[in-house]
Amino acid sequence: MKVSSALFVAFLMLKKVREKPNVAKKMNTTDAKFDKIRSLFSGKRVLVAFSGGVDSTVLAHIAKQSAAESKLLTVDSITFPRTELQAAKDVAKELGIGLEVIQVDELSNKELVSNPVDRCYHCKKELASVWLNAAEELGMDFVVEGTNASDMEGHRPGAKALEEAGVFSPFRDAEITKDEIRAYARRAGLSVADRPSMACLSSRFPYGTEITEDRVRRIDKIEKDVRELFGVKCVRARFHGDLVRIEVGREERSKLFDESKLDELYDLCKKAGFKYVTFDIFGYRTGAMNEALES
């Protein structure tokens, strides 16, 4: 998919903000950063890679306001939680933007199944191909996705794949943080403003551990059950062979500090096929499976 010279210039302007921190500091307000994105979208037909989370929702909101035309594309796969797919459909209706859903078979990709340290690179590379092909078929000018400046901390091989493919990450390039995105969502009255971040289910497995359909479905069910039974918004079920490690949001840990609730947690994890169940007392933190790399 070819990018016009004018669009490329606009993209470079965004990159300059990222590459020169002193430029970003000179911006008077956060709104000036968002204005850069509005300028990028102006007069263009924009396809938003859409998950229904706060990042892609705010990006879609800006596209609807600023672009000549905007469409949403959700890629559905075994590693996309079932609850997230429905949420994406609901938020698309809230935004009033057309949503395309494309089904892909991630587990047919051996590089993803083997779960190497650079798994996210291979995953994003495949996703980028799907997005760009869809954009061409739909007659859109370019594809954008919601990686933000806060996401760039730590191990992020997926960002490299997106940049190589020519998928734009406007929030990252304008140095817009997660907090700034949430603040925008609140001002805009978007329902997802305080929605916890969600990563694909592949992130629940230690690098080098094979990712299978059965394992993914077990993890997905546990997380769904924990949310429903205990009213927890943020939960991760980390796979460690016969053992599953449960993380919940740090401010939500007390919701499970009860003997009967811990028994319920144990029972539902046993039913999912695990011999051992642990509750991570520190709670959820992003990139937990990358901690092994740091050690």
Outline where the language-model segments fall.
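Short, conserved charged micro-motifs
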Residues: 253-261
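Mid-to-C-terminal catalytic subdomains of enzymes
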Residues: 172-178, 182-227, 233-234
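Polybasic, lysine-rich low-complexity intrinsically disordered segments
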Residues: 2, 15-22, 26
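Aromatic (phenylalanine/tyrosine) cluster motif
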Residues: 8-11
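ATP-dependent adenylation/nucleotidyltransferase module used to activate substrates
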Residues: 24-187, 244, 260, 264-274, ...
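A short linear hydrophobic-aromatic micro-motif
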Residues: 232-237, 276-278
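Short, aliphatic-rich beta-strand segments
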Residues: 239-250
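Short, low-order "capping/linker" segments at domain edges
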Residues: 287-295
